Each structure stands twice: as C-alpha cells, then as structure tokens.
C-alpha cells in the first residue's frame, strides 16, 4: 500500500515553516483526538497518521531525509519502537559483519511507547504533576524473562546461535533474521505458561509525570527507560508523553500570547471606564478609553502564557465587542430616541466617522457605476 504524503496529511505545503506545521498539527490533533471521538476507528487512525507526520516534519533532520528520500529515508526511524537506520539497510544487502548482527539480534532494546495526555490551559500555565497508567511489556516473573519453564535455552540449530543466517543471491551476499528463532539465537523446548515463551508479559504501570509550566500543544515529555522491557539484558525503551491542551472557554493560545473577546456595554464604549479582565493568574483592571469601537484590541503586557524555555511571558490581547442593548423597556427605548434626536442631523459627520466614510465610499462607487 502506498504511504500518504506527510505534508498532505497535515494540509501544509512542502515549504511550510515549523510554526505553520505546528499550528496545522494542533488543529488536526484537537479534531481527531480519540477522547473527542470515542469508538471512532477512522478518527483513531487519522490521529495516528497526524502524529506520525508531525513527528517527522517537526524534526529538521528527519524532515530533510524525508524530503530527499521520501518514506524510505525515515521508515527505519519514524514511529515508536523503530531502531536502526541506513546502516541497517546496508547490513541487509552487504552483510555488515557477523559479530555485529549477532549482538544486535541477541540483545534487543525495548520498544518506545507513546501516551497522549490531555491537560487544561491552566495546568499548562502553572505546571502540574499527573498520574498516568500505561500498558507495557515487562520481563516475565515466572521464568525470569527466559521464556522457558526450566529457565534454560537451546542454541538454535538453524543459525547456530547467531540470530541471523547468510544467503547468496547472484553476486550479492546478505544476512537476514533467522526465521526459526526470530533472531534470538536460541530455541525453547518448554515454553513458560505465563508468557508462552515470549519472556515478556503485558502489565499495567502507574507513573507520575511532571508537566513543566509553559508546555504547549504537541510538546513531548520523555521518560527514559519507562517503555517496553528490553530483551536479554538490553535497555528498556522510553515513554513519550504527548501533550494535548483542551480548548478554553475564554482564551485562545497562539504561541505564548493569549487572545480573548471582551464584551463591553454601549455606554462604557461611549464614555469609557474601568472593567475587570480575567487572566490565568487573577483579575486585572483595564481602562477603556472613551469612544472605543468594536474590533479595538487592548494589549495587557506579560499577562499571557509563560515560556517553556527562558523566563519570558507573553501578552494578553483583548478584542473589544460592543454589545447592543436587548430587552429594552418602553421607557428605555424612548430615552434612546431622545438621545438619537439630540445628536442632530449632522450625526454621521460628527459622531460616526466610520459610518460617514462608508457612506461616502458607497456614493462615490454609485456615481462611477452610473456615469
């Protein structure tokens, strides 16, 4: 099956910047996250595709290999649990040395694991410690990880303990994993009842994860050695905790800045005054200047998100939305009519500059159209 283009998966061009790629990933990850689509297998598959694409394109080195060689340049290293690289490709076709192949097959590093953790914007701001439970492969206690009831192993008769066998095709000699022992170099005659000869069993592991303040959507936290157990004394894999930040009711995050819409009353917009604005670490008072219009943006410096790296802090940008009064009584309507009358016939020129400009443009356009 032909693999999908990573750029197409994220809906970005091949010249997209790192910021554009990250923004596209955040949007798609939120849309297809399994927690938002429970039981939807297609959404789960799509989320995995999005995560894989972002893993490659967010890494300059991997992205460069992908741009040069396509999926062949990154398949050995993309995803979790992948090992090896171009050296393994050459080893497959040209041997690479019996000793090196034997060591690699006998001692195998455990697979890396990924866990998606959803947190609130407040938790991303202040930092938090979360407890998670993951399924992972651990060494079988019943057989001490040997896979054998008697804890004994027999050297594989096919590869003589090497884990690989050498084959000749024309002028080429190459090594491949032994199909009899699957590269272990040994065979088991009395499989363990608990792990069925695998040497590993799946267990639930509970861990505490410290989330630093300032973490962002798509960031990954590495827990070294908390992945699947290695084989034959090899190192365990790592656990990568990928952060997803829930949508906030008030704020929208853009890098380290926060944005919000701030509704103000008709009278407050006209005459100005103080209003209380919520931030992630408490309320602040904002002075609204008289004659404020819808769309005006007030910047509250250093009231945004904390930076993950360094001591910078972003700003909070509040966009004004002037609310039109509703559910007016007869008396209130009468007062507004009197107010409108008090503005006089030259209302547009004196009191509504934007309206005057708009109507003037309409007149100019109509004049040209009908000439």
Swiss-Prot record:
The keyword Cell cycle does not apply. A zinc finger (CR-type) spans 127-204. Its cofactor is Zn(2+). CXXCXGXG motif repeats lie at residues 140-147, 156-163, 178-185, 192-199. GO terms for cellular component: cytoplasm. Its main location: cytoplasm. The keyword Zinc applies. Keywords: Chaperone, Cytoplasm, DNA replication, Metal-binding, Repeat, Stress response, Zinc, Zinc-finger. It comes from the Bacteria. Binds 2 Zn(2+) ions per monomer. GO terms for molecular function: ATP binding; heat shock protein binding; unfolded protein binding; zinc ion binding. Signal peptide: none annotated. Zn(2+) 1 binds at residues 140, 143, 192, 195. GO terms for biological process: chaperone cofactor-dependent protein refolding; DNA replication; protein refolding; response to heat. It is found in: Cytoplasm. Residues 5-70 form the J domain. CDD domains: DnaJ, DnaJ_C, DnaJ_zf. Participates actively in the response to hyperosmotic and heat shock by preventing the aggregation of stress-denatured proteins and by disaggregating proteins, also in an autonomous, DnaK-independent fashion. Unfolded proteins bind initially to DnaJ; upon interaction with the DnaJ-bound protein, DnaK hydrolyzes its bound ATP, resulting in the formation of a stable complex. GrpE releases ADP from DnaK; ATP binding to DnaK triggers the release of the substrate protein, thus completing the reaction cycle. The J domain is necessary and sufficient to stimulate DnaK ATPase activity. Zinc center 1 plays an important role in the autonomous, DnaK-independent chaperone activity of DnaJ. Zinc center 2 is essential for interaction with DnaK and for DnaJ activity. Belongs to the DnaJ family. This is Chaperone protein DnaJ. The gene is dnaJ.
């Amino acid at each position: 099956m032909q693999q999908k283009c990573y750029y197409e998966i994220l809906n970005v061009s091949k010249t997209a910047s790192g910021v554009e790629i990250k923004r596209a990933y955040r949007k798609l990850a939120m849309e297809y996250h399994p927690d938002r689509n429970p039981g939807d297998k297609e959404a789960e598959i799509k989320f995995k595709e999005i995560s894989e694409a972002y893993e490659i394109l967010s890494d300059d080195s991997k992205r460069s290999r992908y741009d040069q060689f396509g999926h062949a340049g990154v398949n050995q290293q993309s995803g979790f649990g992948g090992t090896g690289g171009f050296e393994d490709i050459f080893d497959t076709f040209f041997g690479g040395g019996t000793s090196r192949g034997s060591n690699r097959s006998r001692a195998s590093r455990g697979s890396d694991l990924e866990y998606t953790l959803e947190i609130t914007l407040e938790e991303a701001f202040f930092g938090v410690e979360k407890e998670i439970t993951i399924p992972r492969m651990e060494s079988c206690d019943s057989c001490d990880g040997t896979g054998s009831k008697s804890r004994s192993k027999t050297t594989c008769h096919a590869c003589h303990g090497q884990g690989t066998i050498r084959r000749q095709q024309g002028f080429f000699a190459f090594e491949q994993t032994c199909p009899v022992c699957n590269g272990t170099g040994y065979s088991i005659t009395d499989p363990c009842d608990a792990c069925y000869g695998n040497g590993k069993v799946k267990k639930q592991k509970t861990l505490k994860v410290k989330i630093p303040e300032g973490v962002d959507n798509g960031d990954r936290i590495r827990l070294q050695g908390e992945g699947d157990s290695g084989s034959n004394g090899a190192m365990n894999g790592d656990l990568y905790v990928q952060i997803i930040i829930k949508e906030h009711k008030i704020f929208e995050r853009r890098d380290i800045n926060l944005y919000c819409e701030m509704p103000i009353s008709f009278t407050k917009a006209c005459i100005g005054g103080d209003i209380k604005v919520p931030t992630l670490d408490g309320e602040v008072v904002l002075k609204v200047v008289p004659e404020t219009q819808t769309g005006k943006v007030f910047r509250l410096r250093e009231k945004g998100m904390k930076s993950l790296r360094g001591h910078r802090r972003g700003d909070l940008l509040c966009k004004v939305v002037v609310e039109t009064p509703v559910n007016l009584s007869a008396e209130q309507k009468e007062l507004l009519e009197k107010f409108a009358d008090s503005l006089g016939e030259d209302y547009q020129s004196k009191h509504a500059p934007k309206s005057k400009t708009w109507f003037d443009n309409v007149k100019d356009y109509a004049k040209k159209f009908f000439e």
